[in-house]
């Protein structure tokens, strides 16, 4: 529940079959989990940080992505096998003395990491969220199925411009010197995993954005409602089918993670969410989001059938 301080935990369950084999592995000081069966491998890697927290956000981002790349290479999994990514960015909307915004520096580093990769099923689902300290930290869920038994598809939302297609108008700060211009946030609005007649969908961090513009000046209740409407349309039966997922109904949302910028808005946001989803497990955290005018961001997981 919302509290002024303390620890909150979210637990994800993975159902294993008789064919699945699970291993806990290490690469240097990085622990990770592999679930594998013939023709299919899944990787869970979390808490990847840089070695030097006083380095710039740009330097830390490049280092963290380099460490992730080494794990993927060790496991024989391409960068494009990443289906979900959680990106925790210290003081996400802050700018340094040279005019570089933390979030933009991270996005430029991510673009360079993704460069040259064939994203045939779309970019990963992702959340980019602020922290008070800690530099850059990334969690990754990757899936590689060579036997064709599982389909992985990016899901777009017609209510919003794809984040990776944003114009320069909504990108702040200075660009990376290695790039011709500032680069966009490389993620899909959702990522679906489908097998035979069922699956699940990772809903990316979603906010009160229509097109590429934030909904400003309306207060936390309206931003929360608009965010939920964006998610509901995203995982609707019609939109899933439009994205190539043969779901027969809307995705059933099974969990939310709610990021609220201001403590005084926490209870108001909770009331809007619980009124619409009274039985849905949700955790609430006090944290900054990727635009200064946005007051809330919500991510989730849904079940497909």
Residue locations for each model-derived region?
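N-terminal presequence-like segments and the immediate start of the first folded domain
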Residues: 1-86, 91-305
């Amino acid at each position: 529940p919302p509290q002024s301080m303390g620890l909150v935990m979210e637990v994800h369950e993975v159902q294993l079959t008789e064919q699945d084999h699970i291993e806990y592995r290490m690469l240097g000081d990085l622990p990770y989990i592999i679930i594998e069966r013939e023709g299919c491998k899944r990787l869970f890697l979390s808490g990847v940080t840089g070695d030097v927290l006083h380095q710039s956000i740009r330097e830390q981002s490049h280092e963290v992505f380099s460490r992730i790349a080494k794990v993927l290479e060790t496991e024989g999994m391409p960068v494009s096998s990443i289906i979900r990514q959680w990106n925790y960015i210290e003081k996400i909307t802050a700018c340094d003395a040279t005019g570089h915004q933390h979030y933009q520096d991270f996005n430029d580093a991510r673009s360079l990491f993704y460069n040259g990769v064939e994203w045939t099923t779309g970019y990963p689902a992702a959340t980019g969220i602020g922290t008070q300290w800690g530099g850059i930290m990334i969690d990754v869920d990757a899936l590689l199925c060579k036997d064709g038994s599982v389909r992985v598809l990016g899901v777009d939302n017609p209510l919003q411009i794809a984040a990776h297609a944003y114009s320069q108008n909504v990108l702040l700060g200075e660009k990376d010197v290695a790039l011709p211009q500032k680069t966009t946030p490389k993620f899909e609005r959702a990522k679906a995993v489908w097998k035979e007649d069922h699956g699940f969908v990772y809903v990316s961090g979603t906010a009160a954005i229509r097109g590429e513009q934030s909904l400003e000046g309306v207060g936390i209740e309206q931003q929360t409602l608009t965010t939920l409407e964006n998610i509901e349309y995203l995982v609707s039966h019609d939109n899933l089918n439009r994205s190539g997922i043969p779901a027969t109904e809307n995705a059933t949302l099974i969990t939310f993670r709610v990021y609220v910028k201001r403590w005084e808005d926490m209870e108001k946001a909770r009331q809007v969410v619980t009124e619409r989803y009274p039985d849905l497990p949700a955790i609430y955290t006090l944290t900054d989001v990727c635009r200064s005018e946005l007051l809330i961001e919500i991510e989730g997981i849904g079940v497909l059938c």
